[in-house]
Curated annotation (Swiss-Prot):
Gene Ontology process terms (BP): cell division; cell wall organization; peptidoglycan biosynthetic process; regulation of cell shape
Organism: Shewanella halifaxensis (strain HAW-EB4)
Full protein name: UDP-N-acetylmuramate--L-alanine ligase
Residues annotated to bind ATP: 128-134
Catalytic activity, as annotated: UDP-N-acetyl-alpha-D-muramate + L-alanine + ATP = UDP-N-acetyl-alpha-D-muramoyl-L-alanine + ADP + phosphate + H(+)
One GO CC term, this protein: cytoplasm
Pfam family, one: Mur_ligase_M
Keywords, ordered alphabetically: ATP-binding, Cell cycle, Cell division, Cell shape, Cell wall biogenesis/degradation, Cytoplasm, Ligase, Nucleotide-binding, Peptidoglycan synthesis
Amino acid sequence: MSNKAEKYSQLRSMIPEMRRVKHIYFVGIGGAGMGGIAEVLVNEGYKLSGSDIAESAVTQRLAQLGATIYIGHDASQVKGMDVVVVSTAISADNPELVAAKELRIPVVRRAEMLAELMRYRHGVAVAGTHGKTTTTSLIASIYGEAERDPTFVIGGLLNSAGTNARLGHSRYLIAEADESDASFLHLQPMVSVVTNIEADHMDTYEGDLEKLKTTFVDFLHNLPFYGVAVVCIDDPIVRELIPRIGRRIVTYGFSDDADVQALDFKQTGYSCEFTVKRAGLADLRLSVNLPGEHNVLNALAAIAVATEDDIEDAAIIKALAEFQGIGRRFQQIGEFATSKGEIKLVDDYGHHPSEVAATIKAARLGWPERRLVMIYQPHRYSRTRDLYEDFVEVLSQVDCLLMLDVYAAGEAPIPGADSRALCRSIRVRGQVEPVFVASTEQLETILPEILQGGDLLLTQGAGSIGLLSRSLTESNLGFAATGKDEKNA
């Protein structure tokens, strides 16, 4: 164990029973959520190993920190482990999972390990269908600016830290709470945030929206009676659930009855300016270095959490104004000089209709003079099926649409819930003429024909499209070399 890890091994001192655990194995270690927890544990001084199907920036970073990384899953790799951590993406027949059970090695889900990290810390858990990563990142940034030195585990790359996880040396732990498999019920934080609730991951909830709602209420009731629930009152389902929440509540939003309210919103390019009204406190006029009303809501959640913890306004204002963003959350890749003129490239992770709509609205507000060209990759056949008409409506709002095939994420195809079907339905709607693109390689031929000078090109989705911005950068958006002028934001 390094001197740093020995000095600050808080988990072992807080949970003596964890001293028995020497070697931890992660199956699917390259995922953002898994990799973040793994990074905190390896920095705590635990011996750590893990596997994934491919090398990634996450696995490379963990290897540099001292973890043993295997590419590919093999039963022999879990021998001698004290505990095996698995993500929900790991199938029951995974050879490492099967071997762990045969060897009677404890198998825990990612959220259970996160719960152990949080057990004796002051935990802030951020849940909701949309906005978790951004909100968690904003809270972590404010606490960092206030010199609270938090530990954080985030589902995306926090640009200012160069990582999605960090071991702090204080009592604070700030983390995303994942409702996709209801595993957030393992967490027992001091502060819980709910950004919004929509029908998503409905297979977990047997297609029952009421079951989803009840699970969120149960999550909030994991708070101690002296904890606080910070919830977005603008969201209709959250507002509906407030009478069922038996904990102290702080609401936020644009609504007049919000405890922490945003007023006088204005977006200029990438940043938003607004006034924050809080009961019994002076109003704040501030800006957040993120676009869109949805990001103002995310900022309000962070402000509410920080205000509850008596963080000074100066730290809040500075952290939000200087926020450097998160990977793949309206990430400005650059501006490119082409034979057609300058074109701006933005990459975004949103893959639910509401997220896509918020991204489109932010782009329209920030750059109203630009034509909006979207390359979209649907994520999961089941989501496409369940939200089909919503996708048709929101994707019809761009000026030009290029549609990649569905990223299956392990699912079998569902007839009528694929990209070709979406293109047909969008075409019938008549607002935009979509172009189906069978492979990303075709984009180098298609883009120079479609793009115009001044366009905003948006790559959108949660699957393999996340790698597209790099290849587009290398090929200058498919144009022949014309003096690329990349300005990373």
